Amino acid sequence: MCKNMRDPRHDILFEPINIGPVTSKNRFYQVPHCSGMGWRRPNTLAAMRGVKAEGGWGVVNTEYCSIHPTSDNDAFPYCALWDNEDIISHRKMTDEVHKHGALAGVELWIGGSLIVNLGTRLPPLGLRNHPQQDTSVYHPGQTRCMDKNDIKNIRKWHRDAAKRALEAGFDIVYVYATHGYLLSEFLNPETNIRSDEYGGPLENRVRFIKELIEDTREIVDGKAAVATRFSVGLNDSESYDAFALLADLPDLWDLTVPDYSVEMGNSRFIKEAALKDSVLKARQLTSKPVVSVGRLTSPDTMVQLLRENVQDL
């Protein structure tokens, strides 16, 4: 019996690729996604991520991972890297992932006005004194408008979380700048009404993201890659202008689109590779590798995306 039944047309999918200082063994990249487990069920979560690595994924990521108690999304199951106890929980996952030769990534998350902090009872930090914005959460909440000291604190909390991520064994550390959370608020001129160096012109509105990418790169110091998750949309030209200002800062771009129903829509209604055109336009602006999603199930489609230089993973 033939030992290798793989169609040689698909060999490119199994080629290794460098992501900054680390190398994925292939082009199969599990982007951050929720699991229903989070910090409450670390053993089950580690086993699930480990099964993915055993199945052949080159990179396996966590779900959104809070950097500080001011970003608490109870009762939704999120991950956390608040203190050293969380390092132990995450080490369970990274050990399982590494056991099968895959890289482990963590998506550091700052909530903003989409959260209520039902668990910690701390005021959520946002760009306005404003009721919380997540219409799926039927609890009253109020965001406290951030001042410069809050920005300074968040940068410190993010650096501290990146340090813990290294201690937990992660190979890729994210700056999470999409899906409506705090960094998205900075980008959006409708929510960012600041009059200081973090508001106004686009160069100012991307400043905080730029600082967090640079902070994270300094902390990981070549021991892990820095990824940035970011949205671009063909109907939003400024999203590409913002992307261009940051284009070569991280080691990897994890690109999506602003419309959740397209990014995560049912395959009955959303065609395979639905994000292709949006991602390609951004891909042409950066020299760094790009990963994206899009209900990809056909290896032929995956190969086409790589051959056409739409994305790298």
Residue spans of the language-model regions?
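Flavin-dependent oxidoreductase catalytic cores
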Residues: 1-313
